[in-house]
Amino acid sequence: SAASDVYKRQGWTGYSWNTELFKDYKSFLNNLQNRNLKVTLNLHPADGIRHFEDMYNDVAKAVGIDPETKEDVKFSCKSDDFWNAYFDKVHKPYEKDGVDFWWIDWQQGKKSDIEGLDPLLALNHYHFLDNAENGKLPLILSRYAGLGSHRYPLGFSGDTAINHKVLDFQPYFTANAANAAYFWWSHDIGGHHFGYKDDELYLRWIEFGVFSPILRLHSTSNDLLGKEPWKYRRDVYLSAKKWLNFRHRLIAYIFTMDYKCHKNGTPLCKPMYYAYPNEESAFNVPNEYFFGSELIAAPITSKTNKKTNMATAKAWIPKGTYTDIFTLQKYHGPMDITLNRELYDIPVLAKEGAIIPLSNDDGNSSANPKALEFWIFNGNNSFTLYEDNGRVNFEKHNAKTKILNTFDEKSRKIKLTIKAPFGDCEVIPSGRKYKITFKEIESADVKLNKEFTISNSDSALSIEVDFSSDDIEIELTNIKLIKMPDYKERVINSMSRWQEQTSKKTAYYKPFKNAQTREELLKVLRISKLPKEIKNLLYEQLITD
């Protein structure tokens, strides 16, 4: 009956728009495109094309079925007629209307009408090739179809429950997938269904998502499970907004890392033991991973401790000096450590000399940034920024910009060179402006071979200069480093935030009162009977510069 047909069309599987919800879906898609938003639609092809679909008549005729019979057009891997109709009659018209790529959500097993062929792998293959038409870089979103699926990015890890256990698993899952060459996982950030409402859990999930291959907020169809930041308490909303904006700023860094992955097979997220296979500690931190060439991330997946108002992440610091890009704390490895952070922070550590390109453009465009900022950390390093035209011929139409960073600690002198871009510089937006922020420098004498202005960014020295087709050379002397709180002040601040009876806190603090140096404070800490969570917090404060 007509009524039952409408009911089926409103169900889970189908290829026709619900016109009660989208009265003019073409205008809706056009509006999204005008907002610089890309569109993907969720597919469940297992039931084929049924008689109540808008395009059924055309599909049925194409495969030799009389539409009057209302016979289902069954999904088939071996029928050329089916594949041609599937793309030409079902998907391509919607692509002309504004759909950019497809989310392939096959969940009906690995058997098809071709023995040994997983239908999801076949769908991935054909959709990926089809999406490359007209010069586009091909993209799909899909469930995992087994080994070899890494050829068809990107991945969808499935419907997850909303709880801390699932969040705790995902950083390990994401980094560990590098062992199967599956680098581009995406998760339902915030969780998909079931579980419980927890604003803290939501924000921690977003923080992890910012430092994962793909950030994709999603939930099941439930009015009470929306993942929009404004549906959470105000402090969480403001922090989520900050993190989502920062993720967009990372577009230049992540794009460069994804190009390196394409060329060299180096994953954006990789386990610590990839670089340190002989270090036992590198195998004992499953939730810590390299995020590109410059950063290490250790997402916090545990609940906030009510005594410290902080949550923790287990981490291992490799040999060398690593600086938290947000708190500027310096960690000297190798060492095992428990990292403590407030709800609004995630531990992300930069290697010595790290160079991190960030977009300074307003809005949500995915184009190469017109305003580009470089975060510079003290040390010796080089970094090559990659940009292209976003088309399949990108190997011919790309530009690379090399940045050299040298730091002479003894003379307190920094030299930074932004080399002249090489390649197809037409992909670089005209009128580009650079902002170079030395994250650990408060002030310095600046020498530059171009006109420039000096500004301060969160107390750090920033230099602004126009793009140049020649080398830009910056030299800093008489450097004044940003001063961190002294160690006694750190002890006082940490113990002040301790949620405990004043008399008890005062008694524990008494032995620290007469200690002045870091060594004296650490000695008191070692013999103190403080609760473990407070000792961990104080230890981190005392061993970092």
Predicted regions and their residues:
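Residues that cap or initiate secondary-structure elements
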Residues: 47, 146, 278-280, 303, ...
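Accessory, solvent-exposed terminal regions and/or long lumenal/extracellular loops of proteins
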Residues: 352-450, 477-545
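A surface-exposed beta-strand-loop module
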Residues: 455-473
